[in-house]
Regions:
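Short, low-complexity, charge-dense intrinsically disordered segments
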Residues: 2-11, 20
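Zn-dependent metallo-beta-lactamase
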Residues: 17-88, 193, 317
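Pre-active-site segment of Zn-dependent metallo-hydrolases
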Residues: 35-40, 64-109, 113, 118-122, ...
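Beta-strand-turn-beta hairpins that frame and shape the catalytic cleft
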Residues: 41-47, 61-66, 157-166, 208-214
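Active-site neighborhood of phospho(di)ester-bond hydrolases with catalytic His/Asp-centered motifs
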Residues: 68-69, 103-113, 132-134, 215-220, ...
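Active-site HxH/HxHxD metal-binding segment of metal-dependent hydrolases
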Residues: 77, 95-158, 163-178
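Binuclear metal-ion centers of metallo-dependent hydrolases, dominated by the metallo-beta-lactamase
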Residues: 142-145, 149-157, 256, 261-329
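Active-site-proximal loop/helix segments of hydrolase catalytic cores
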Residues: 188-258
C-alpha cells in the first residue's frame, strides 16, 4: 500500500511538471542583473567558480581543480517518472568535460540521487579523480562501475593539494512530504533506474583554499549548522540548494549562521532539459522568495551563474572581512 502511495505521488509530480512546464520561459527571467561571469583566464588571485548545471560546480585555484556533483546527462523526465532504465550519456558528458580541467583532484558528492551521482563513475574513469562522498554513495558508485572511493562522514577532514575539505551534516528536502528515493531498492546490485540511485546520507562541504572559504550543500542545510571553528566563521561564498520549500524555509537561518560575502542559490534550474537548451528555472523553484530572503542579509551579495561561464570569487581585501563591492560583470 505504501508503494502505491509513493508511485501515486510520483505520478502527481510528473503531471504537475508536464502541465506547468510551459509556464517557465527560458533564461533568467527578470534576474539577468544577478548573473556574473568573467574571463576564462585562470585567476591569479581568488577562486574560479564554474557552474555545471543542477548542483554541479568546478572550483579552480593555483592550477588545481575540484568538482562537486557533476551531472551532464540530464536524463529526461518521463524515464525518471516511469522507472525506465537510465544511464550516463557519454556524448553529453564529453561535451561538459570540454569546459573543465583535465585532471581534477577530487569529486565531492552531496548525496546519491541520479542528478548528483549518475555521471560520476564515467567522469572518474576519464579524469582519474578521487571520489569523496558518504559510504552509501561510494558503494553505489562502485556498483555502477567506479573505482573505490573515499567514504567520509560529518566531522571528517580531507586535504588534497591546496584544498582543505571539511565534511558537514546535511539533510534532503521532502517532496510531497517524503524524501524521494530515500532507501536502497531491494535486490538491486547495479543501479539501472532513477529509484536505484537512493539518497543515502546527505552531506555538505566546507572548502578552504587560498585563504577563502566556500560552503556548499544541495538543499539540505540543517536548521542549525554546526559551529565552524576554523577562520572567522564567515563564508566568502555560500552555495545553497533552495529548489524545494524545506530548504527555502531554512534559508534565513542558514544565512545568519554563514554570513557570506556572496550568496549563490543552487539547484534552481530545470535539470530535465539538456544543458545546450540553456538555463531555465525549475517549476518548483521560488526565486522571488529567495531574493527577498537574501536581501535581508546586510553585507551579502546575491549572484547567479550561467552554465560554463566562469566567475572568479574575489579575495577580500586585507585580512578583515569586507562587504563585497558590486563589480562590472
Amino acid at each position: 500500500m505504501g508503494d502505491i502511495r509513493v508511485i501515486g505521488g510520483h505520478l502527481c509530480f510528473v503531471l504537475f511538471l508536464i502541465l506547468s512546464g510551459q509556464a517557465f520561459g527560458r533564461g533568467f527571467g527578470p534576474y539577468p542583473h544577478l548573473v556574473v561571469s568573467r574571463s576564462r583566464a585562470a585567476p591569479s588571485n581568488g577562486v574560479r567558480v564554474t557552474y555545471l548545471g543542477t548542483n554541479g560546480y568546478q572550483f579552480e585555484s593555483k592550477g588545481h581543480a575540484l568538482l562537486v556533483d557533476p551531472y551532464f546527462s540530464r536524463v529526461n523526465l518521463l524515464s525518471v517518472a516511469f522507472g525506465a532504465p537510465i544511464e550516463p550519456n557519454a556524448s553529453r558528458i564529453n561535451d561538459g568535460l570540454r569546459h573543465l580541467a583535465s585532471y581534477p583532484d577530487a569529486i565531492l558528492v552531496t548525496h546519491g540521487h541520479f542528478d548528483h551521482l549518475l555521471d560520476v563513475p564515467f567522469i572518474m574513469a576519464r579524469t582519474r579523480a578521487r571520489l569523496i562522498a558518504s559510504t552509501s554513495c561510494v558503494d553505489l558508485a562502485k556498483r555502477a562501475g567506479a573505482l573505490p572511493g573515499d567514504p567520509v562522514k560529518p566531522g571528517d577532514v580531507r586535504r588534497i593539494g591546496p584544498w582543505t575539505i571539511r565534511v558537514l551534516p546535511a539533510k534532503h528536502d521532502r517532496l510531497f512530504g517524503k524524501v524521494p528515493f530515500d532507501r536502497p531498492a531491494a535486490r538491486v546490485t547495479v543501479p539501472r533506474r532513477a529509484a536505484d540511485w537512493n539518497c543515502g546520507e546527505p552531506l555538505a562541504f566546507l572548502i578552504e583554499v587560498n585563504g577563502q572559504r566556500i560552503y556548499i550543500d544541495s538543499g539540505g542545510t540543517p536548521e542549525q549548522l554546526p559551529l565552524i571553528k576554523s577562520g572567522n566563521g564567515r563564508m566568502d561564498l555560500a552555495i545553497l540548494g533552495v529548489a524545494l520549500p524545506d530548504s527555502r524555509a531554512r534559508l534565513n537561518a542558514a544565512l545568519e549562521r554563514l554570513h557570506p560575502r556572496y550568496i549563490l542559490p543552487s539547484h534552481q534550474d530545470n535539470f530535465f532539459r539538456p544543458l545546450n537548451a540553456g538555463f531555465q528555472f525549475g517549476p518548483l523553484t521560488d526565486f522571488s522568495r529567495v531574493q527577498r530572503e537574501c536581501a535581508q542579509q546586510n553585507g551579502s551579495r546575491l549572484i547567479l551563474l550561467d552554465y560554463f561561464k566562469p566567475w572568479t570569487l574575489p579575495k577580500a581585501a586585507g585580512s578583515k572581512w569586507q562587504n563585497p563591492k558590486r563589480e562590472t560583470d
